[in-house]
Regions:
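Structured, solvent-exposed acidic/aromatic patches
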Residues: 1-220, 259-261, 269
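C-terminal functional modules
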Residues: 210-340
Protein backbone atom coordinates (compact mmCIF):
# COMPACT_ATOMS: atom_id res chain seq x y z
CA UNK A 1 0.00 0.00 0.00
CA UNK A 2 2.85 2.41 0.78
CA UNK A 3 4.38 1.87 -2.65
CA UNK A 4 1.01 2.57 -4.28
CA UNK A 5 0.95 5.81 -2.29
CA UNK A 6 4.42 6.60 -3.62
CA UNK A 7 3.22 6.07 -7.19
CA UNK A 8 0.11 8.18 -6.65
CA UNK A 9 1.90 11.05 -4.94
CA UNK A 10 4.62 11.09 -7.58
CA UNK A 11 1.95 11.48 -10.25
CA UNK A 12 0.24 14.24 -8.28
CA UNK A 13 3.49 16.06 -7.47
CA UNK A 14 3.05 15.76 -3.71
CA UNK A 15 6.60 15.85 -2.38
CA UNK A 16 5.56 16.26 1.27
CA UNK A 17 3.56 13.04 1.18
CA UNK A 18 6.50 11.21 -0.39
CA UNK A 19 8.78 12.52 2.35
CA UNK A 20 6.42 11.00 4.92
CA UNK A 21 6.74 7.64 3.15
CA UNK A 22 10.54 7.51 3.39
CA UNK A 23 10.37 5.92 6.84
CA UNK A 24 7.65 3.45 5.84
CA UNK A 25 7.94 -0.08 4.47
CA UNK A 26 8.02 0.16 0.67
CA UNK A 27 9.16 -2.14 -2.15
CA UNK A 28 12.88 -1.43 -2.07
CA UNK A 29 14.59 -4.85 -2.08
CA UNK A 30 14.49 -7.51 -4.77
CA UNK A 31 12.72 -10.04 -2.55
CA UNK A 32 9.78 -7.61 -2.40
CA UNK A 33 9.46 -7.19 -6.19
CA UNK A 34 5.80 -7.07 -7.21
CA UNK A 35 5.57 -9.32 -10.25
CA UNK A 36 3.35 -11.98 -11.79
CA UNK A 37 5.19 -15.25 -12.36
CA UNK A 38 4.22 -17.13 -15.50
CA UNK A 39 4.78 -20.87 -15.86
CA UNK A 40 4.90 -23.46 -18.62
CA UNK A 41 1.46 -24.78 -17.65
CA UNK A 42 -1.08 -24.95 -20.46
CA UNK A 43 -4.14 -25.99 -18.41
CA UNK A 44 -4.91 -23.34 -17.44
CA UNK A 45 -2.79 -21.28 -19.82
CA UNK A 46 -0.02 -19.61 -17.82
CA UNK A 47 2.69 -18.95 -20.41
CA UNK A 48 3.96 -15.38 -20.80
CA UNK A 49 2.00 -13.56 -23.52
CA UNK A 50 5.28 -12.07 -24.76
CA UNK A 51 6.45 -15.61 -25.49
CA UNK A 52 3.11 -16.85 -26.75
CA UNK A 53 2.80 -13.98 -29.21
CA UNK A 54 6.33 -14.13 -30.59
CA UNK A 55 7.81 -17.62 -30.42
CA UNK A 56 5.50 -20.47 -31.54
CA UNK A 57 4.73 -18.94 -34.97
CA UNK A 58 7.43 -16.30 -35.41
CA UNK A 59 7.53 -12.84 -33.94
CA UNK A 60 4.34 -10.83 -34.01
CA UNK A 61 5.61 -7.27 -34.50
CA UNK A 62 8.57 -4.97 -34.94
CA UNK A 63 10.78 -3.75 -32.13
CA UNK A 64 11.54 -0.04 -31.87
CA UNK A 65 14.73 1.26 -33.45
CA UNK A 66 14.54 4.05 -30.89
CA UNK A 67 14.69 1.51 -28.07
CA UNK A 68 17.63 -0.20 -29.78
CA UNK A 69 19.29 3.22 -29.65
CA UNK A 70 18.71 3.56 -25.91
CA UNK A 71 20.45 0.21 -25.43
CA UNK A 72 23.25 1.14 -27.85
CA UNK A 73 22.45 -2.02 -29.77
CA UNK A 74 23.57 -0.75 -33.16
CA UNK A 75 26.86 0.09 -34.77
CA UNK A 76 27.86 2.83 -32.29
CA UNK A 77 27.64 5.57 -34.91
CA UNK A 78 25.57 8.75 -34.58
CA UNK A 79 22.88 9.16 -33.36
CA UNK A 80 23.91 6.44 -30.88
CA UNK A 81 24.87 8.31 -27.74
CA UNK A 82 24.11 8.01 -24.03
CA UNK A 83 26.67 5.76 -22.34
CA UNK A 84 28.68 4.88 -25.44
CA UNK A 85 28.65 1.14 -24.68
CA UNK A 86 26.12 -1.64 -25.05
CA UNK A 87 23.67 -1.92 -22.21
CA UNK A 88 24.63 -5.13 -20.32
CA UNK A 89 20.97 -6.20 -20.47
CA UNK A 90 20.92 -6.12 -24.27
CA UNK A 91 21.27 -9.85 -24.98
CA UNK A 92 18.72 -10.63 -22.26
CA UNK A 93 16.15 -8.12 -23.54
CA UNK A 94 16.47 -8.77 -27.27
CA UNK A 95 16.96 -11.82 -29.47
CA UNK A 96 18.19 -11.67 -33.08
CA UNK A 97 16.92 -14.32 -35.45
CA UNK A 98 19.14 -13.58 -38.45
CA UNK A 99 22.83 -12.80 -38.95
CA UNK A 100 22.08 -10.78 -42.06
CA UNK A 101 21.40 -7.11 -42.75
CA UNK A 102 17.91 -6.37 -44.08
CA UNK A 103 17.81 -5.11 -47.66
CA UNK A 104 15.48 -4.73 -50.62
CA UNK A 105 11.84 -5.37 -49.76
CA UNK A 106 12.92 -6.13 -46.18
CA UNK A 107 14.15 -2.54 -45.79
CA UNK A 108 11.66 -0.29 -47.62
CA UNK A 109 12.95 2.79 -45.74
CA UNK A 110 16.45 2.53 -47.24
CA UNK A 111 17.65 5.90 -48.56
CA UNK A 112 14.70 7.84 -47.13
CA UNK A 113 15.95 10.85 -45.19
CA UNK A 114 12.74 11.07 -43.15
CA UNK A 115 13.93 8.16 -41.03
CA UNK A 116 16.24 8.68 -38.05
CA UNK A 117 17.51 5.12 -38.13
CA UNK A 118 15.84 2.86 -40.70
CA UNK A 119 18.31 0.14 -39.66
CA UNK A 120 20.62 0.41 -36.66
CA UNK A 121 23.10 -2.30 -37.63
CA UNK A 122 24.40 -5.44 -35.92
CA UNK A 123 21.48 -7.50 -37.27
CA UNK A 124 18.90 -5.76 -35.08
CA UNK A 125 15.84 -5.78 -37.34
CA UNK A 126 13.31 -3.19 -36.18
CA UNK A 127 11.40 -0.16 -37.41
CA UNK A 128 11.32 3.57 -36.76
CA UNK A 129 8.35 4.95 -34.84
CA UNK A 130 5.36 5.50 -37.12
CA UNK A 131 6.76 3.52 -40.07
CA UNK A 132 3.69 2.22 -41.89
CA UNK A 133 5.42 0.77 -44.94
CA UNK A 134 4.24 -2.59 -46.21
CA UNK A 135 5.19 -5.63 -44.17
CA UNK A 136 7.33 -8.25 -45.91
CA UNK A 137 7.38 -11.90 -44.89
CA UNK A 138 10.08 -11.37 -42.28
CA UNK A 139 8.56 -12.56 -39.02
CA UNK A 140 11.32 -15.17 -38.70
CA UNK A 141 14.00 -12.50 -39.16
CA UNK A 142 12.88 -9.60 -36.98
CA UNK A 143 14.48 -8.98 -33.61
CA UNK A 144 12.14 -10.01 -30.82
CA UNK A 145 11.83 -10.41 -27.05
CA UNK A 146 14.69 -12.24 -25.38
CA UNK A 147 14.85 -14.26 -22.20
CA UNK A 148 13.79 -11.32 -19.97
CA UNK A 149 11.01 -10.82 -19.10
CA UNK A 150 9.01 -13.15 -21.34
CA UNK A 151 10.97 -16.37 -20.89
CA UNK A 152 12.32 -16.48 -24.44
CA UNK A 153 15.86 -17.07 -25.71
CA UNK A 154 19.20 -15.59 -24.66
CA UNK A 155 21.05 -14.07 -27.62
CA UNK A 156 24.35 -15.93 -27.79
CA UNK A 157 24.81 -15.37 -31.54
CA UNK A 158 22.95 -18.55 -32.46
CA UNK A 159 20.64 -16.70 -34.89
CA UNK A 160 18.01 -19.44 -34.94
CA UNK A 161 14.39 -18.79 -35.79
CA UNK A 162 12.29 -18.41 -32.66
CA UNK A 163 9.84 -21.04 -33.91
CA UNK A 164 12.64 -23.59 -34.28
CA UNK A 165 13.01 -26.49 -31.86
CA UNK A 166 16.76 -25.78 -32.02
CA UNK A 167 16.28 -22.47 -30.18
CA UNK A 168 16.73 -22.99 -26.41
CA UNK A 169 14.24 -20.90 -24.42
CA UNK A 170 12.59 -20.77 -21.01
CA UNK A 171 9.37 -21.81 -22.80
CA UNK A 172 7.52 -18.72 -21.66
CA UNK A 173 8.27 -19.08 -17.96
CA UNK A 174 8.74 -15.35 -17.60
CA UNK A 175 7.33 -12.57 -15.46
CA UNK A 176 5.17 -9.49 -15.66
CA UNK A 177 7.25 -6.82 -13.84
CA UNK A 178 4.37 -4.90 -12.25
CA UNK A 179 6.40 -2.77 -9.83
CA UNK A 180 9.98 -3.70 -8.98
CA UNK A 181 12.34 -2.48 -6.28
CA UNK A 182 14.40 -0.81 -8.99
CA UNK A 183 11.33 1.24 -9.95
CA UNK A 184 11.03 2.49 -6.37
CA UNK A 185 14.61 3.77 -6.41
CA UNK A 186 14.07 5.59 -9.71
CA UNK A 187 10.79 7.05 -8.43
CA UNK A 188 12.50 8.44 -5.33
CA UNK A 189 15.35 9.79 -7.45
CA UNK A 190 12.78 11.61 -9.58
CA UNK A 191 11.05 12.97 -6.46
CA UNK A 192 14.36 14.34 -5.21
CA UNK A 193 15.05 16.23 -8.41
CA UNK A 194 11.55 17.32 -9.35
CA UNK A 195 9.70 17.67 -6.04
CA UNK A 196 12.44 18.66 -3.62
CA UNK A 197 12.29 15.50 -1.53
CA UNK A 198 15.43 15.25 0.61
CA UNK A 199 17.09 12.19 -0.94
CA UNK A 200 20.32 11.47 -2.81
CA UNK A 201 18.96 11.15 -6.35
CA UNK A 202 22.31 10.15 -7.84
CA UNK A 203 22.79 7.27 -5.39
CA UNK A 204 19.18 6.14 -5.79
CA UNK A 205 19.54 6.06 -9.57
CA UNK A 206 22.72 3.98 -9.29
CA UNK A 207 20.98 1.56 -6.91
CA UNK A 208 18.01 1.31 -9.27
CA UNK A 209 20.26 0.43 -12.20
CA UNK A 210 22.12 -2.17 -10.12
CA UNK A 211 18.89 -3.81 -8.96
CA UNK A 212 17.62 -3.97 -12.52
CA UNK A 213 20.88 -5.43 -13.83
CA UNK A 214 21.01 -8.08 -11.11
CA UNK A 215 17.44 -9.17 -11.78
CA UNK A 216 17.84 -9.37 -15.54
CA UNK A 217 21.22 -11.11 -15.53
CA UNK A 218 19.93 -13.74 -13.10
CA UNK A 219 17.06 -14.49 -15.44
CA UNK A 220 18.85 -16.63 -18.04
CA UNK A 221 18.73 -19.63 -15.71
CA UNK A 222 20.17 -22.76 -17.28
CA UNK A 223 20.31 -21.32 -20.81
CA UNK A 224 23.75 -21.28 -22.40
CA UNK A 225 25.32 -17.83 -22.69
CA UNK A 226 28.39 -18.98 -24.63
CA UNK A 227 28.88 -18.51 -28.35
CA UNK A 228 27.13 -21.06 -30.55
CA UNK A 229 30.39 -21.88 -32.36
CA UNK A 230 33.06 -21.02 -29.78
CA UNK A 231 32.38 -21.93 -26.16
CA UNK A 232 35.35 -19.86 -25.01
CA UNK A 233 33.30 -16.73 -25.78
CA UNK A 234 30.72 -15.99 -23.09
CA UNK A 235 28.14 -13.26 -23.69
CA UNK A 236 26.78 -13.20 -20.15
CA UNK A 237 27.04 -9.74 -18.62
CA UNK A 238 29.73 -9.52 -15.94
CA UNK A 239 29.93 -7.41 -12.80
CA UNK A 240 32.65 -5.41 -14.57
CA UNK A 241 30.27 -4.69 -17.47
CA UNK A 242 27.62 -3.48 -15.04
CA UNK A 243 30.06 -1.36 -13.03
CA UNK A 244 31.37 0.25 -16.22
CA UNK A 245 27.85 1.05 -17.38
CA UNK A 246 26.83 2.57 -14.05
CA UNK A 247 30.04 4.60 -13.86
CA UNK A 248 29.36 6.07 -17.30
CA UNK A 249 25.79 6.98 -16.37
CA UNK A 250 26.99 8.63 -13.16
CA UNK A 251 29.63 10.60 -15.08
CA UNK A 252 26.92 11.75 -17.49
CA UNK A 253 24.74 12.70 -14.51
CA UNK A 254 27.55 14.71 -12.89
CA UNK A 255 28.19 16.56 -16.15
CA UNK A 256 24.50 17.42 -16.63
CA UNK A 257 23.70 21.06 -15.93
CA UNK A 258 20.79 21.50 -13.53
CA UNK A 259 18.09 19.27 -12.15
CA UNK A 260 16.13 19.14 -15.40
CA UNK A 261 19.04 17.62 -17.31
CA UNK A 262 19.72 15.20 -14.47
CA UNK A 263 16.04 14.23 -14.37
CA UNK A 264 16.18 13.34 -18.06
CA UNK A 265 18.96 10.84 -17.30
CA UNK A 266 17.11 9.32 -14.33
CA UNK A 267 13.96 8.84 -16.39
CA UNK A 268 15.88 7.36 -19.32
CA UNK A 269 17.42 4.77 -17.01
CA UNK A 270 14.03 4.00 -15.46
CA UNK A 271 12.62 3.61 -18.95
CA UNK A 272 15.37 1.14 -19.86
CA UNK A 273 14.79 -0.83 -16.64
CA UNK A 274 11.03 -1.02 -17.30
CA UNK A 275 11.28 -3.47 -20.22
CA UNK A 276 8.10 -5.54 -20.17
CA UNK A 277 6.10 -2.88 -18.31
CA UNK A 278 4.35 -0.25 -20.41
CA UNK A 279 2.43 1.46 -17.61
CA UNK A 280 5.28 3.12 -15.73
CA UNK A 281 6.91 4.56 -18.88
CA UNK A 282 3.53 5.91 -20.03
CA UNK A 283 3.00 7.62 -16.68
CA UNK A 284 6.53 9.01 -16.44
CA UNK A 285 6.32 10.34 -19.99
CA UNK A 286 3.09 12.21 -19.27
CA UNK A 287 4.46 13.35 -15.91
CA UNK A 288 7.91 14.58 -16.98
CA UNK A 289 8.07 14.60 -20.79
CA UNK A 290 11.03 12.21 -20.57
CA UNK A 291 12.69 10.25 -21.96
CA UNK A 292 13.11 12.07 -25.25
CA UNK A 293 11.63 9.62 -27.73
CA UNK A 294 11.95 9.40 -31.47
CA UNK A 295 9.64 11.64 -33.47
CA UNK A 296 7.30 9.65 -35.69
CA UNK A 297 8.27 9.22 -39.32
CA UNK A 298 4.80 10.38 -40.38
CA UNK A 299 2.41 12.69 -38.48
CA UNK A 300 0.23 10.61 -36.18
CA UNK A 301 -1.77 13.29 -34.38
CA UNK A 302 -1.58 14.39 -30.74
CA UNK A 303 0.06 12.17 -28.16
CA UNK A 304 -2.67 10.25 -26.26
CA UNK A 305 -2.85 11.73 -22.77
CA UNK A 306 -5.41 9.06 -21.82
CA UNK A 307 -6.94 5.95 -23.35
CA UNK A 308 -10.32 5.90 -25.04
CA UNK A 309 -13.04 3.68 -23.62
CA UNK A 310 -13.40 0.37 -25.48
CA UNK A 311 -16.26 0.25 -27.98
CA UNK A 312 -17.79 -2.67 -26.08
CA UNK A 313 -18.30 -0.29 -23.14
CA UNK A 314 -19.69 2.69 -25.05
CA UNK A 315 -21.97 0.49 -27.17
CA UNK A 316 -23.50 -1.27 -24.18
CA UNK A 317 -23.69 1.68 -21.78
CA UNK A 318 -25.41 4.82 -23.14
CA UNK A 319 -24.32 6.77 -20.05
CA UNK A 320 -20.67 6.58 -21.04
CA UNK A 321 -19.44 9.45 -23.18
CA UNK A 322 -16.46 8.54 -25.32
CA UNK A 323 -13.33 10.48 -24.47
CA UNK A 324 -10.70 11.89 -26.82
CA UNK A 325 -7.03 11.03 -26.98
CA UNK A 326 -5.99 14.49 -25.79
CA UNK A 327 -8.20 14.33 -22.68
CA UNK A 328 -5.96 14.62 -19.61
CA UNK A 329 -6.44 12.53 -16.47
CA UNK A 330 -6.90 14.35 -13.16
CA UNK A 331 -3.23 14.31 -12.13
CA UNK A 332 -1.89 15.32 -15.54
CA UNK A 333 -1.68 19.08 -15.02
CA UNK A 334 0.95 19.70 -17.67
CA UNK A 335 -0.20 22.04 -20.45
CA UNK A 336 -1.85 20.82 -23.63
CA UNK A 337 0.81 20.06 -26.20
CA UNK A 338 3.33 19.33 -23.44
CA UNK A 339 4.12 16.15 -25.37
CA UNK A 340 4.14 16.44 -29.13
Amino acid sequence: ANTLKLKANLNMGNGAAITDLLSENIIDTDDEDFQFNYSIATLPESISPLFQGNYPNGTGGYMSNGFFDFLNAGDAEAPFVETGIEDPRLRYYLYRQKDQDPSGSSLPCAGNGDYDYCYVGNFYWGRDHGDDEGIPNDNTKRTTFGVYPGGGAFDNNQYNRVDSSNTPTLNGEGINPIFLSSFTHFALAEAGLDLGVGVDSKALMAQGIQLSMDKVIDFSGALSTTDEDDETIDYAATSANVSDYIARVLAEYDAASGNEAKLAIVIREWYNASWGNGIEPYNMYRRTGYPTLQTGVFPVGPFPRSFRYPSSETNSNPNVNQTTADNQVFWDTNPAGFIN
